[in-house]
Amino acid sequence: MTDVARPDVQACEQVRLTAWVRGRVQGVGFRWWVRARALELGLTGVARNLPDSRVEVVAEGPRERCAELLELLSGVPRHGRPGFVAGVTAEWSTARGGYSGFTQA
């Protein structure tokens, strides 16, 4: 009998991560950096500047990959992350679709 590896259901669950990033994150290439990391992770969504100087990141894909993006946004600066992140507020929800690739607005 052959054992078939079953993927972790939670890791494969399609989710939406909405993250609001505070700090010096506008005018420094931060959205372009987010887009590059999201595409590397196979995520879809958008990164956009908000009037209050935050950047909103909406990403959809497997929960595990979205969690990796959140760690890149909020963790110790690496991968040449531009600007300065003072804090990140995140919200998880069910993926809604509607994105084609990952854009910056």
Swiss-Prot record:
EC number(s) on file: 3.6.1.7
Catalytic class of the enzyme: hydrolase
Coiled coil: none
Domain of life (superkingdom): Bacteria
Active site: 31, 49
Keywords: Hydrolase
MF-aspect GO terms: acylphosphatase activity
Domain Acylphosphatase-like: 16-105
Recorded catalytic activity of this chain's protein: an acyl phosphate + H2O = a carboxylate + phosphate + H(+)
Gene3D superfamilies named among the record's database cross-references: 3.30.70.100
Family matches, as InterPro entries: Acylphosphatase (IPR020456), Acylphosphatase-like_dom (IPR001792), Acylphosphatase-like_dom_sf (IPR036046), Acylphosphatase_CS (IPR017968)
Membership in a protein family: Belongs to the acylphosphatase family.
Protein name from the UniProt record: Acylphosphatase
Organism whose genome encodes this protein: Acidothermus cellulolyticus (strain ATCC 43068 / DSM 8971 / 11B)
